């Protein structure tokens, strides 16, 4: 009897003399969730591209259902029931949800009614409410992820690989996804789960394999290890303090004040303040209005009413340029689209928010000063790059995020807003980014952090504001931090606020 759906034996892969994989062993069993863990650059995605038929290994064997197999392209893998859902989604933005789900069956299945009916059935199974006739390009990133999963479920799958599936999902949607994964596991599907969120990995996985520098560190049963053991395997050392000590910071006078803010449909009568040296979190479900609040404060979306004040002075923000001039910076949730110019050098990205500091009186660039400033920034942020002339696209996710942070360190404003600051970042880089965020507060900045990772909010923030349906429903402090309290406030609002936190 075959006990493994897939067995990757002694897999090696080189790209131009660089060893991406070195004799890696990995297997997938029916009815099991096998987590694949490691820092960015460890080789996880490369190994899954081998399983998905996207790349051919330099050495080693791919065994599917007990038979040695050559997977020459993704079609070979799909024919064997292997589907890989990548972090970078492969959808056609100008086609409808239904057309994307059944793209492989077009044009043979041309009835729009049939397409949409079948698509709705799949989406309903996933527990989401998405119009199958809507263009994919108009969906949120979270709902695009749902479409990608529905597309996989439309096929007769034996193995499904999830690469960072909850990176763009809030807690509620992540719970729905985990229910789906458990259902697939119960049907005998083999599941590979890649994630940097170790708490959810321990919740969903039966086994874990850790990779480092293109090699297998080890495979363990989830019940046999603790999170600290996995971190040590991943980074080669224990991370004693993932989050910095709050006691090292001095909280001063109020810097940012937002009063009765209304913007579009998603920001309704929002009021709060952030003081110098303070880190305030903004929590809630996806679609609660958190990102929209950030965009309104940054001048990216127009206000319908309300005031934004900095150091007691009301601001008139008609654009992000106005916000930057006033001293407000934003690290957006999608760093590749809005945080950096991905193909430009590190030095250009790091100085673009305050070019005036590296040009002369005539407006010409002073290259020596630019290099000096960016080199110093890179050292202070522990940026790992071959050169400050390297394009941002050549960096890992964690180092790309450091470049976005470098931009605002260089700009020197008073208020920094960070939207999902560690999305897609490995555990070692997370600890470094947390330290950098804390450094901003130590330097007297007012810091607003938006995150779908509750432990991130609780570990970093002095206070956490709970948002729901475009409103701030309440506030939590360290004495009553818990996921139950945050979700309770976000979903139920004032009815439970007296028991769980302060009303704002």
Swiss-Prot record:
Keyword Ribonucleoprotein found: no
InterPro entries reported for this sequence: AAA+_ATPase, ABC_carbohydrate_import_ATPase, ABC_transporter-like_ATP-bd, ABC_transporter-like_CS, P-loop_NTPase
Cellular location(s): Cell inner membrane
EC numbers for this chain: 7.5.2.7
Primary enzyme class: translocase
GO molecular function terms listed in the Swiss-Prot or TrEMBL record: ABC-type D-ribose transporter activity; ATP binding; ATP hydrolysis activity
Topology class, membrane: Peripheral membrane protein
GO cellular component entries: plasma membrane
CDD domains: ABC_Carb_Monos_I, ABC_Carb_Monos_II
TM region(s), chain numbering: none
Main subcellular location: membrane
ABC transporter domain location: 6-238, 251-494
The keyword Iron appears for this protein: no
Catalysis: reaction(s): D-ribose(out) + ATP + H2O = D-ribose(in) + ADP + phosphate + H(+)
Superkingdom, taxonomy of origin: Bacteria
Similarity remark: Belongs to the ABC transporter superfamily. Ribose importer (TC 3.A.1.2.1) family.
Subunit comment: The complex is composed of an ATP-binding protein (RbsA), two transmembrane proteins (RbsC) and a solute-binding protein (RbsB).
Record PANTHER family: CARBOHYDRATE TRANSPORT ATP-BINDING PROTEIN MG119-RELATED, D-ALLOSE IMPORT ATP-BINDING PROTEIN ALSA-RELATED
Main function: Part of the ABC transporter complex RbsABC involved in ribose import. Responsible for energy coupling to the transport system.
Protein name: Ribose import ATP-binding protein RbsA 3
UniProt organism field: Rhizobium meliloti (strain 1021)
Higher taxonomy: Bacteria, Pseudomonadati, Pseudomonadota, Alphaproteobacteria, Hyphomicrobiales
Gene that encodes the chain: rbsA3
């Amino acid at each position: 009897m075959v006990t493994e759906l897939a067995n990757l034996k002694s897999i090696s892969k080189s790209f131009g003399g660089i060893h991406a994989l070195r004799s890696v062993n990995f297997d997938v069993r029916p009815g099991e969730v096998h987590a694949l863990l490691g820092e960015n650059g460890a080789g996880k995605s490369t190994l899954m591209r081998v399983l998905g038929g996207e790349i051919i290994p330099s050495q080693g064997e791919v065994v599917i259902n007990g038979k040695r197999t050559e997977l020459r392209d993704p079609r070979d893998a799909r024919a064997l029931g292997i589907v890989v859902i990548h972090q970078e989604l492969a959808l056609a933005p100008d086609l409808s949800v239904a057309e994307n789900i059944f793209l492989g069956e077009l044009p043979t299945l041309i009835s729009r009614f049939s397409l949409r009916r079948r698509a709705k059935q799949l989406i309903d199974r996933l527990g989401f409410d998405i119009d199958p006739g809507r263009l994919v390009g108009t969906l949120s990133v979270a709902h695009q992820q749902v479409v990608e999963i529905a597309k996989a479920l439309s096929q007769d799958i034996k193995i499904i690989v999830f690469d960072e599936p909850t990176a763009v999902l809030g807690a509620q949607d992540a719970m729905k996804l985990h229910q789906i994964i458990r259902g697939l596991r119960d049907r005998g599907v083999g599941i590979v789960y890649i994630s940097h969120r170790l708490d959810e990995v321990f919740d969903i996985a039966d086994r874990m394999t850790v990779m480092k520098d293109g090699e297998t560190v080890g495979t363990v049963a989830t019940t046999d290890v603790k999170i600290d053991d996995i971190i040590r395997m991943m980074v080669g050392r224990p991370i004693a303090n993932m989050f910095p000590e709050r006691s090292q910071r001095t909280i001063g006078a109020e810097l940012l004040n937002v009063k009765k803010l209304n913007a579009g449909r998603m920001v309704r009568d929002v009021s709060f303040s952030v003081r110098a040296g303070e880190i305030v979190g903004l929590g809630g479900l996806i679609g609660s209005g958190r990102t929209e609040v950030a965009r309104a404060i940054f001048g990216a979306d127009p206000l319908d009413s309300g005031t934004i004040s900095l150091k007691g002075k009301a601001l008139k923000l008609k654009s992000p340029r106005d916000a930057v001039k006033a001293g407000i910076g934003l690290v957006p949730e999608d760093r590749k689209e809005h945080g950096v110019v991905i193909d430009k050098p590190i030095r250009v990205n790091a100085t673009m928010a305050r070019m005036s500091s590296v040009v002369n009186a005539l407006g010409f660039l002073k290259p020596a000063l630019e290099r000096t400033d960016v080199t110093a920034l890179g050292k202070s942020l522990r940026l790992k790059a071959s050169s400050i002339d390297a394009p941002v696209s050549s960096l890992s996710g964690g180092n790309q995020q450091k470049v976005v942070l470098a931009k605002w360190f260089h700009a020197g404003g008073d208020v920094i807003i960070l939207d999902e600051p560690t999305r897609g970042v490995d555990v070692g880089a997370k600890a470094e980014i947390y330290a950098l965020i804390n450094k901003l507060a130590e330097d007297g900045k007012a810091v607003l952090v938006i995150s779908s990772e509750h432990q991130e909010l609780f570990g970093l923030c002095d206070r956490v504001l709970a948002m729901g349906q475009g409103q701030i429903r309440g506030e939590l402090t360290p004495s009553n931090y818990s996921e139950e309290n945050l979700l309770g406030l976000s979903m139920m609002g004032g009815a439970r606020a007296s028991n769980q936190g302060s009303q704002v």
